[in-house]
Amino acid sequence: MKKVLLTLAALGSLSATQAQQAGSWLIQGGMTRIAPSVSSGTLSAPSPSGTTVDVGADNQVTAQVTYVVDQNWALAVPLGLGFKHKLYGTGSIAGVGQIGTVSALPLSVFAQYRFGESNAKFRPYAMLGLSYAYFHDAQGSATLNSLNPLNPVGGSTGLKVDSKFALSPGLGMAYQLDDRWFVDFSYAKSLLKTTTTLSTGQSINTTLNPAIITLGIGMRY
């Protein structure tokens, strides 16, 4: 009986170690919050002088697939259906409220360096990602229509937000619950700038630099 117990214990230890070897896949699901930290330029003329903008945060259900390259290195690809952000007037038009919306689909790949032994229960990591922020379905609100001096009577002001590449450095931590299940938390900052152009010709440059905060639970394969 004692030999059987020792054998089972050894197998359990072996499976925990093998599960984190090169070639393992980590599949997780959870929530991601994208919160822009906006530094806005001013809207070009003709427009109210000093017109600037802010961009609201959004939370969505997301997933992530990670491939373990070796004991320390891994490649992670976040997955999701995208985010929808509200646009607000600031500066000389502060207080007017929402002036539009834009949908964003971030396409990213992250290289992670995981500290500690491969079979450790707690592993912090540093990461660097390349992200492509695909902006689509940007729409101006009735408030923007009324503020735009070039908007035709009864018409609407369209928006186009340029899609851009950005580097995304970050930190994270993973905690192994058992041989297969784990909890993962990460924080990244995407160094993102873009330009928004109105259908009537005015444009505005913005530094978005969104924080990307993800909490997930997953399984190791």
List PLM regions with ranges.
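Cleavable N-terminal export/targeting peptides
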Residues: 1-23
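Short glycine/proline- and aromatic-enriched beta-strand/turn motifs that initiate or cap beta-hairpins
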Residues: 19-66, 218-220
